[in-house]
Amino acid sequence: MKRLGTILALLMALAHPAWAQADFDSQAKFAILMDHETGTVLYQKDADLPMEPASMAKLMTLAVVFNEIANGRLALTDELYVSENAWRTGGAASGGSTMFAELNSTIAVEDLVRSVIIQSGNDAAIVLAEGIAGTEATFAAMMNELALDIGLTDSHFTNATGLPDPEMLVTARDLADLGRYLIRTYPQYYHYFSEPEMEWNGINQPNRNSLIEVGIGVDGLKTGHTETAGYGSVISTDAGGRRLVAVVHGLASMRERAEEGRKLITWGARAFERVAAYADNAIVAYADVFGGESGSVGLVGNGEIALYLPRGSRRCLSAEVHYVGPLMPPVMAGDQIAELQVFCDDRLVQVAPLYAAQSVAEGGIMRKATDALRQLALGWL
């Protein structure tokens, strides 16, 4: 592993990553606040402990639905059948959050998606699961497979609704990452999350995320509640052009859920600022190439590399570029070959992938011989 140490001459600062805990405390049992763009964690409280997801599990249901649409196996206009299981388990007779779907009717996928988001319809979630996979259990297996692909390594799903099951557990960190995944991967569907209400079967229901109506930039994502888990929410907000994603869970009431969510995102928007570290296509460092037409290759970010910093800090940042090297040709432009690790003091606070700025073809015999002699004499510095 090669490590290239460098000091970022940015004349800016990054406080110790524990700054958030010193300046803010949430009453939620579990909480996390992330910068959507960089994934920087601005605040966390027991974010890696297992918790019951309640209806926030429906975000994973939506991820599978959107993935099926993206792969051509489902369309928003497809009509799905309302089975007796969906009607009894998630419908009006269940006593839980429901779309009030009629037994034996068919409903368009788009309406089911809107119901899952706005009304938290358990019947809508089950209809989607059965329509896609045949059974909810098979659909849950699809949820877990996609969750692992996304990188949600500490979560396990057993149903499409979030109804209580002792084997269904997630973490606040995984829910925040899931929210970021949905925003990043499926922006064409994001507008559903901010719809204020939905009417179905003659019954009008408001969006259960009350924060979308209070004028603080919240436009998603999903609330949840069970008697055992308490009240929780995955929140997304546009904070003056910077998007934040938050999770609060384990609260005692809807009012407390809304208040703790509002406090967390408002604090994050005021306490931190976005700073551009490297412009798009700017060379961050160079990586050695053994036996190539060129002895090194420039490393760039995937667009601009930005940092999310405490507002008003003025301490210097340090950074290191890490890669397994020397690299062997051919190296193709755009290959991910390194990562930029940003530190505050000695603590890692952000990681950004780095890519080859240009291609490097295999060199001739003389070039390989020269590199071999250099390696024998000096090693790769």
Describe each region flagged by the PLM.
Residues 10-11, 52, 100, 251:
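A general, composition-driven signal for non-globular sequence regions
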Residues 14-15, 70, 272:
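Hydrophobic alpha-helical membrane context
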Residues 15-22, 355:
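Bacterial Sec-dependent signal peptides at the C-terminal "C-region" and cleavage site
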Residues 20-173, 180-186, 198:
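Active-site-adjacent loops and short helices of periplasmic peptidoglycan-processing enzymes
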Residues 152-156, 164-381:
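Domain-terminus/edge residues, biased toward the C-terminal soluble/receptor-binding domains
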